[in-house]
């Protein structure tokens, strides 16, 4: 084993020495393999080897050291220690390699010369540093103690060296044999003997070696004797002979790497403890002394041998020397020949194999050594790294500890400071809350006083009287405000009042003063508007006063004479209320329930102003586009004296209309160019710049929900108009939230209701939360809200003011999803998740809202009809051909006969010569003669039949056929034979006779030719089965059974992709055209196959020809079954179209019952595409209908409404909820069906009131189709919630929560999509805080979704603004 890897950390010098010696030992392995083995054997029994004289100094030195360490021998000489040191410490010059090279160059040189050459390279420094090397050996011993873990590697290396040594024995034995023979021959010659040495066979050289060793011992003893004579010379010779003897032993046995390794291995095994090491050293000292004696004996023998050799050499003559030389050369050549021819290649291969094996093992050894070295290094690095990691961890934990300690102290300090601040803040909040409460109470009291003062003047309570809602659960209790009626004082600024120190009485007085000032300011503003002089220089103050008389106080008026209709009692009260508002300069909201005549009341107040105060305008009426014509017609009908300008149309038309009020020096009297201008919300915003120039006497906004948003440009534009009074007409002032009510109130009284935040703090939050979660509502707060609203708003309900108006019955019709709808619904549900919906709901971006709205619309489509996603289209083969065309059907007669005119696009041009020379009979072909031959040789020719009538054709008489008829049958094809055999019976033809009962059949003028013969037909009374309908069916049940068979209901398995007529054959010859036409379209066959023409049948009936004498017709065979016919066009099944939608199936049943009971129906839709599908259904069921949606023009809307009201044969009116739900009168209908409901329940209420309004005498039934267990059912719950808000605010009703509804929170749109499943509820009810946040997000998201749903639509005027 290479020990350098073991000594790398302790002694670099020693490591290098060991490595160098190891390399030399490996190189010397070629010549010393056999000698190593012998030396090792000699080392195991040292005494015997010395007795025989076979041991060398160097070989025994290493072997004896190994045996001494094992305890097998008694002692050794000093050369063992020298050899151990030499095997470890490197030599400056390596004599081993030089001796090997000299042996290879000349094997026959003198042995003594080889020893002398090796001795010259011995370094003298070695002897001088001997003691230092011993110390190095002791250090190495200490290192070897640490190398016990490398024993396995040492064993492997030892096995490798043994293998290399055994492989090199063959070559060493051969070389030793040759050298021994040569030396023996030379010795015999020198001693005067004739023998040339003992001849040996190939193989072992043990005997020769033994003899040579004996000679060497003798020579060494002789040399010792000669050395004693020399005195001092012998002493120096003994000193110098030590390396000489050492060199002499090298040719016989050279130390190999295996021996070194073996000795090192044995040394490592022995020196396991320090005590063992010390004992081994003592034994080595003992053996060292014995070694010196042997060294001296060997030097003596060699000296004697040298002297004897010199004497013998002097006696040899020149001739003998040549003979010896020649003999030596011949022997040397023969030896090398045998060596090169036989053993050279074999030894070379063995050397290569041994070298390769040695290199492989050395690589393995180096890898293992490197691994072990890295393992030690890795262990040290890991320990160092662990130490660093532990230090960092300790530092980090210490830092975290102090940081946590500081944080805890800081938090405690902040907590203490926060407690102090919270306490101070709480006290401040209590003071501020008390201050704000007093502020809020001051504002509400001021508003109440203002309303109280106005109410006393315009007497709203008296006008409402018993017409108000009896469900209102409170009465006015503000009589204590009367003491502030005549209070005087200066108004106080709201910000200058000290709410902390002022008492309640002083605050009430200040509020009363401010209310009086506000009331006077409103009245003064109205007077200023009336007294504003016109820009006409011809007028004066008196004329102005005549036109605008002084406003009166409390008035009581009757119906104006200008009004050409009779007002009902509650309408007269409404007129008085409006007149008092005008007199006080106060704006108002006429919020009567829909259908109570808000339009005629507003027209009556205009008539009152014109008749009583001579105020003829200008009046501005702004209304949805769908009611423009209605307003114009009613104003012209009720007040014919009013001149009405219908301000709509394109830009050019409106420019012409603006000339009526764009005049200077203009006075509004009875003779003015116009009095009332009627326009739409869209146009008033588009032309706002022109309307702002005018000072309008009275502005009426119909369907005031259109300005429900205070942020819209429409609201801001209308608010900027200069008007003396504003009147808002609405049946539903609150649709979704209290903010809409504030928008209307601020519009009529901007100074009083100037802050939406304050109004929200007053009322909105509590009322809306009460409607959503059924919380307790503050009755006092609700009472104060009604006190504020009462002076500005007049509302009556139908059942209290119109006893003759029929009831309204609302019915929710629940439908189930069909199989196809369920599949679509489940597919949509599986593609959404709770978390995604909540993320979208909390996200305020437009994209998330749009995605949510798209999901909602997809679910609603599934509920309506699955064909909204994918229609079952018409299927047809590709028609490859050309069809006939006509320029105009108007040019055709009433009886249009369509002949066969289809042509194939592919044409075959037949040469004319082919037709004329081949197909036509000429002198050049045999066509004519062939026809004649066929006719002559026809066995059915009449002449043949007549000649053979009694024999072969005797059967003709039994079939009632003549020879000529037989001849004709033989020439006919199968179709012609079927036509001739067709017979008619009376009962069969009655079914297909279209004019059977049209004309009288008494005319018997027709007489068939057969009657002219003197042959009477057999008459009997036997009944014919064919003439009886029922007997015929009973006689043969084949058709009845076939109708119920599966084959009759089977659809075609495949359809042709392409259909085309036959390829057309074209020839430039008129005769060919006629022949082709006769062949393909034989008139007789064609008339028999096709039905009888109408004109021809009419002529036959007029001539009273019996049915049995009719010409043959309608003989085309019937189709295989009811699904397969002669056409490849497949229309989708309408029955399947109806049954695939749960709503449509229910509607189909409902319409049948309604039609039987003479009802007329309004059907409202949200989707125009669903209206398209409904038109197909109504056409299939043959229900007469008309349609109105957002795309209908104004003129068309007027005509449609007129047709519905005047034509009772129209059964169904299809309307869009947004376009047909406002302003139009459809009282001719008594049934309303909502196919799908609107997000806003108020829109649906307005739509159903198109039928349930003034003038309706029958009960109105409202059906609402809802799909069970879907998004529509939950949308209906939210609609009821919104209706609850309206009832609380407008009618004073307190919501009574159902037990079931109280446990179910109203979900937002995300819950509308997912439903009330357990997983969604569990995900949102984990803690109360998250639940509250989700409720807030649901409110905001629901609002965003509703805005998106109606985005792009005109407010209450349809999905698309109509073209004007």
Swiss-Prot record:
Enumerate the CDD domains for this protein: DEXQc_INO80 (cd18002), SF2_C_SNF (cd18793)
Q: Region labeled Disordered — which residues? A: 1-84, 213-293, 1321-1364
The family note in this entry says:
Belongs to the SNF2/RAD54 helicase family.
The entry's protein name is Chromatin-remodeling ATPase INO80
The record's section on SUPFAM superfamilies has: P-loop containing nucleoside triphosphate hydrolases
Instruction: List all Basic residues biased stretches.
Output: 243-255
The record places domain Helicase ATP-binding at 579-751
SMART domains membership:
DEXDc (SM00487), HELICc (SM00490)
Indicate which residues the UniProt annotation says bind ATP: 592-599
Q: How does it assemble?
A: Component of the INO80 chromatin-remodeling complex.
Tell me the domain comment: The DBINO region is involved in binding to DNA.
Q: What does this protein do?
A: ATPase component of the INO80 complex which remodels chromatin by shifting nucleosomes and is involved in DNA repair.
């Amino acid at each position: 084993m290479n020990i350098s890897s073991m000594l790398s950390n302790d002694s670099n010098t020693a490591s290098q020495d060991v490595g160098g010696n190891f390399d030399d030992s490996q190189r010397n392995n070629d010549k010393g393999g056999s000698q190593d083995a012998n030396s090792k054997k000699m080392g195991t029994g040292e005494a015997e080897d010395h007795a025989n004289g076979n041991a060398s100094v160097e070989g025994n030195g290493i072997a004896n050291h190994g045996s001494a360490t094992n305890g097998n021998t008694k002692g050794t000489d000093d050369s063992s220690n020298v050899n151990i040191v030499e095997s470890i410490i490197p030599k400056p010059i390596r004599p081993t390699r030089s001796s090997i090279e000299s042996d290879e160059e000349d094997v026959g040189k003198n042995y003594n010369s080889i020893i002398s050459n090796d001795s010259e390279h011995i370094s003298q420094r070695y002897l001088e540093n001997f003691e230092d090397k011993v110390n190095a050996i002791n250090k190495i011993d200490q290192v070897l103690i640490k190398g016990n873990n490398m024993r396995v590697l040492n064993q492997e290396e030892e096995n490798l060296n043994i293998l290399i040594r055994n492989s090199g024995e063959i070559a060493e034995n051969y070389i030793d044999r040759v050298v021994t023979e040569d030396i023996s021959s030379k010795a015999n010659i020198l001693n005067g003997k004739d023998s040339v040495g003992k001849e040996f066979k190939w193989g072992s050289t043990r005997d020769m070696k033994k003899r040579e060793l004996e000679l060497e011992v003798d020579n060494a003893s002789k040399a010792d004797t000669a050395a004693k004579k020399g005195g001092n010379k012998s002493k120096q010779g003994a000193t110098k002979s030590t390396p000489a003897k050492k060199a002499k032993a090298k040719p016989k046995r050279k130390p190999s790497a295996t021996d070194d390794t073996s000795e090192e291995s044995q040394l490592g095994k022995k020196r396991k403890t320090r005590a063992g090491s010390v004992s081994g050293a003592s034994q080595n000292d003992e053996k060292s002394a014995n070694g010196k004696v042997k060294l001296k004996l060997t030097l003596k023998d060699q000296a004697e041998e040298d002297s004897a050799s010199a004497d013998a050499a002097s006696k040899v003559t020149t001739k003998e020397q040549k003979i010896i030389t020649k003999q030596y050369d011949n022997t040397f050549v023969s030896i090398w020949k045998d060596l090169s021819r036989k053993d050279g290649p074999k030894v070379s291969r063995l050397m290569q194999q041994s070298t390769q094996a040695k290199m492989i093992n050395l690589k393995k050894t180096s890898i293992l050594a490197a691994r072990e070295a890295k393992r030690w290094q890795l262990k040290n690095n890991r320990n160092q790294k662990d130490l660093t990691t532990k230090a960092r961890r300790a530092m980090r934990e210490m830092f975290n500890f102090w940081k946590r300690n500081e944080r805890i102290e800081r938090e405690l300090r902040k907590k203490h400071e926060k407690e102090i601040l919270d306490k101070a803040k709480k006290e401040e909040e209590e003071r501020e809350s008390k201050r704000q409460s007093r502020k809020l109470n001051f504002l509400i009291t001021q508003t109440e006083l203002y309303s109280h003062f106005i109410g006393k003047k315009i007497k709203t309570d008296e006008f409402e009287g018993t017409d108000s809602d009896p469900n209102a659960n409170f009465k006015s209790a503000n009589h204590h405000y009367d003491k502030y009626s005549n209070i005087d004082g200066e108004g106080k600024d709201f910000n200058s009042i000290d709410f902390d120190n002022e008492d309640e009485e002083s605050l009430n007085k200040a509020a009363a003063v401010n209310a009086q000032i506000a009331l006077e300011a409103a009245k003064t503003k109205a007077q200023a508007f009336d007294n504003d002089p016109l820009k006409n220089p011809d007028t004066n103050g008196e004329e102005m006063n005549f036109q605008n008389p002084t406003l009166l106080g409390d008035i009581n008026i009757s119906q104006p004479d200008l009004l050409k209709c009779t007002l009902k009692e509650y309408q007269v009260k409404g007129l008085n209320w409006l007149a008092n508002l005008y007199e006080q300069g106060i704006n108002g909201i006429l919020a009567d329930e829909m259908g109570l005549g808000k339009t005629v009341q507003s027209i009556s107040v205009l008539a009152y102003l014109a008749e009583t105060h001579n105020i003829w305008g200008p009046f501005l009426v702004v209304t949805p586009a769908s009611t423009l014509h209605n307003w114009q017609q009613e104003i012209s009908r009720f007040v014919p004296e009013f001149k009405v300008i219908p301000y709509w149309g394109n830009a050019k038309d409106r420019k012409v209309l603006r000339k009526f009020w764009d005049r200077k020096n203009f006075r509004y009297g009875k003779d003015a160019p116009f009095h009332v201008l009627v326009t739409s919300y869209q146009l008033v915003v588009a032309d706002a710049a022109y309307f702002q120039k005018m000072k309008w006497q009275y502005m009426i906004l119909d369907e005031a929900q259109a300005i429900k948003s205070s942020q819209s440009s429409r609201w801001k534009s209308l608010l900027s108009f200069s008007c003396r009074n504003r009147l808002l007409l609405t049946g539903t002032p609150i649709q979704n939230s209290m903010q809409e009510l504030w928008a209307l109130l601020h519009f009529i009284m901007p100074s009083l209701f100037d802050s939406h935040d304050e109004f929200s703090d007053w009322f909105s939050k509590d009322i809306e939360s009460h409607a959503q979660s059924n919380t307790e509502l503050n009755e006092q707060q609700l009472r104060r809200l009604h006190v504020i609203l009462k002076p500005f708003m007049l509302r009556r309900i139908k059942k209290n003011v119109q006893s003759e108006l029929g009831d309204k019955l609302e019915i929710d019709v629940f439908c189930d999803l069909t199989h196809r709808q369920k599949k679509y619904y489940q597919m949509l549900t599986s593609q959404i998740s709770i978390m995604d919906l909540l993320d979208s709901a909390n996200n305020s971006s437009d994209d998330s809202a749009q995605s949510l709205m798209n999901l909602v619309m997809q679910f609603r489509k599934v509920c309506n009809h699955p064909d909204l996603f994918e229609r079952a289209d018409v299927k047809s083969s590709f028609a490859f051909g050309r069809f006939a065309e006509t320029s105009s059907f108007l040019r055709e007669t009433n009886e249009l006969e369509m002949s066969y005119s289809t042509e194939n696009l592919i044409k075959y041009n037949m040469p004319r010569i082919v037709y004329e020379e081949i197909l036509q009979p000429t002198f050049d072909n045999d066509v004519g003669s062939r026809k004649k031959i066929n006719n002559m040789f026809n066995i059915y020719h009449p002449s043949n039949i007549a000649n053979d009538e009694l024999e072969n054709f005797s059967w003709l008489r039994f079939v009632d056929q003549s020879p000529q008829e037989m001849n004709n049958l033989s020439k006919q094809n199968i179709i012609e034979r079927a036509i001739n055999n067709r017979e008619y019976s009376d009962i069969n033809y009655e079914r297909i006779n279209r004019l059977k009962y049209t004309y009288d059949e008494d005319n018997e003028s027709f007489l068939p030719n057969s009657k002219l013969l003197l042959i009477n037909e057999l008459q009997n009374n036997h009944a014919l089965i064919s003439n009886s309908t029922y007997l015929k069916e009973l006689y043969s049940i084949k058709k009845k059974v076939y109708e119920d068979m599966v084959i009759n209901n089977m659809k075609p398995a495949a359809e042709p992709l392409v259909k085309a007529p036959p390829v057309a054959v074209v020839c430039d010859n008129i005769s060919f055209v006629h022949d082709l036409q006769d062949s393909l379209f034989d008139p007789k066959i064609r008339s028999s196959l096709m039905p009888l023409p109408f004109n021809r049948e009419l002529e036959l009936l007029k001539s009273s020809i019996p049915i049995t004498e009719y010409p043959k017709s309608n003989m085309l065979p019937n189709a295989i079954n009811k699904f397969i016919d002669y056409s490849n066009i497949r229309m989708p099944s309408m029955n399947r179209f109806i049954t695939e939608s749960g709503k449509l199936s229910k509607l189909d049943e409902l319409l049948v019952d309604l039609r039987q009971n003479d009802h007329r129906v309004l059907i409202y839709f949200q989707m125009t595409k669903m209206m398209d599908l409904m038109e197909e259904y109504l056409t299939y069921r043959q229900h007469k209908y008309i349609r109105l949606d957002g795309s209908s023009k104004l003129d068309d809307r007027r005509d449609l409404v007129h047709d519905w009201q005047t034509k009772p044969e129209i059964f169904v009116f299809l309307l869009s909820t947004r376009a047909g739900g406002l302003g139009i009168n459809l009282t001719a209908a008594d049934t309303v069906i909502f196919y799908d409901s609107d997000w806003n329940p108020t829109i649906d209420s307005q739509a159903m009131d198109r039928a349930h309004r003034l003038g309706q005498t029958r009960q109105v039934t409202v059906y609402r189709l809802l799909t069970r267990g879907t998004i529509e059912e939950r949308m209906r719950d939210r609609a009821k919630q919104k209706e609850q808000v309206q009832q609380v605010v407008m009618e004073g009703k307190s919501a009574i929560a159902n037990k079931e509804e109280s446990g179910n929170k109203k979900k937002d749109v995300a819950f509308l999509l997912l439903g009330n499943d357990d997983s969604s509820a569990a995900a949102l009810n984990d803690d109360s805080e998250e639940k509250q946040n989700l409720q807030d997000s649901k409110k905001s998201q629901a609002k965003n979704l509703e805005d998106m749903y109606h985005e792009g639509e005109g407010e209450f005027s349809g999905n698309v603004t109509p073209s004007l």
